[in-house]
């Protein structure tokens, strides 16, 4: 398993131990090297002869080639040092396509959270194959075949295989619930689980859903559960997409209170961010809220409190 997604990721928001047992560099060196790592982008090529699994042709914003040269332009402009790619296809061979696509620049393209058909006879051999590449650091549960009957014995078996290899499970809450994340975390305490996109809440000007807050707090009690502050524009339940930090701050606060500095990471969800605004706009909103926690984090590093 990779030391990349599983090591301490120096990100905008915090240092995520989600992923590691690797020793840290000296404290002085850490604070000097604090960099932004975007842990959630998508890459795909709509010009491939076999087409793409996503996005659909009807998506006028996203249906275009989105490749390394396009993200490099964004990253260079916005000061993003490195990134983790998250699957955008349910086709197993697209994992290899992605790994091949980014092999020319391992310093920027650190890792892939891939897609494998969990709960099937093919899962074990595919996991064995792709996990031999240290950049393949886990999978994402996005689709939910079987509906309410998704969590079969075969699914639990495969989640156990994932945990046994020290890999990470990303979860898109659209088709799953935070309570289900908590159940997986309870049954498989060695499986590192990353909740995507703030916990999946649709953010409006209404009071935040109490049940959602309670579920998130409950899931956070399991130390193998982490949260991505990602896809903030996609979580906005009103249009046009708000650009005021105050609109997102209540959810930021709940996520931060639940998971703290050590179990939150930054992810943009680029290029899906383009549906709501620019990369810089979402980054500035997140930076504006989380900069004080980062200052506290830097101070604790200097004080030798993080080891």
PLM regions and their residue ranges:
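Mid-to-C-terminal alpha-helical segments outside catalytic/metal-binding sites
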Residues: 6-10, 18-20, 25, 29-39, ...
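Short beta-strand segments
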Residues: 38, 84-87, 113, 228-231, ...
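Short catalytic/ligand-binding loop motif for oxyanion handling, primarily in non-cytosolic enzymes
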Residues: 45-46, 92-95, 148, 202-203, ...
């Amino acid at each position: 398993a990779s030391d990349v997604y599983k090591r301490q990721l120096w990100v905008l928001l915090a240092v995520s131990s989600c992923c590691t047992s690797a020793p840290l560099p000296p404290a002085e060196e850490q604070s000097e090297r604090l960099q932004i790592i975007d842990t959630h982008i998508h890459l795909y090529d709509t010009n491939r002869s076999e087409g793409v699994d996503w996005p659909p042709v009807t998506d006028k914003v996203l249906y275009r080639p989105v490749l390394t040269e396009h993200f490099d332009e964004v990253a260079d402009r916005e000061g993003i040092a490195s990134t983790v790619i998250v699957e955008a296809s349910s086709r197993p061979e697209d994992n290899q396509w992605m790994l091949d696509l980014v092999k020319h620049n391992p310093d920027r393209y650190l890792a892939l959270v891939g897609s494998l058909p969990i709960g099937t006879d093919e899962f074990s051999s595919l996991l064995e194959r792709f996990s031999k590449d240290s950049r393949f650091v886990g999978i994402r549960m996005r689709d939910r075949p079987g509906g309410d009957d998704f969590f079969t014995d075969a699914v639990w078996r495969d989640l156990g295989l994932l945990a046994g290899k020290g890999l990470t499970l990303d979860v898109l809450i659209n088709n799953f619930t935070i309570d289900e994340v908590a159940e997986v975390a309870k049954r498989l305490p060695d499986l590192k689980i990353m909740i995507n996109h703030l916990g999946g809440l649709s953010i409006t000007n209404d009071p935040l859903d109490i049940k959602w807050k309670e579920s998130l707090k409950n899931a956070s009690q399991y130390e193998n559960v982490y949260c991505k502050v990602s896809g903030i524009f996609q979580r906005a339940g009103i249009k046009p997409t708000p650009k005021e930090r105050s609109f997102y701050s209540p959810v930021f606060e709940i996520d931060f209170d639940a998971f703290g500095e050590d179990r939150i990471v930054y992810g943009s969800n680029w290029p899906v961010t383009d549906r709501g605004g620019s990369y810089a706009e979402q980054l500035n909103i997140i930076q504006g809220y989380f900069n004080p926690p980062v200052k506290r984090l830097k101070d604790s590093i200097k004080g030798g409190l993080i080891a």
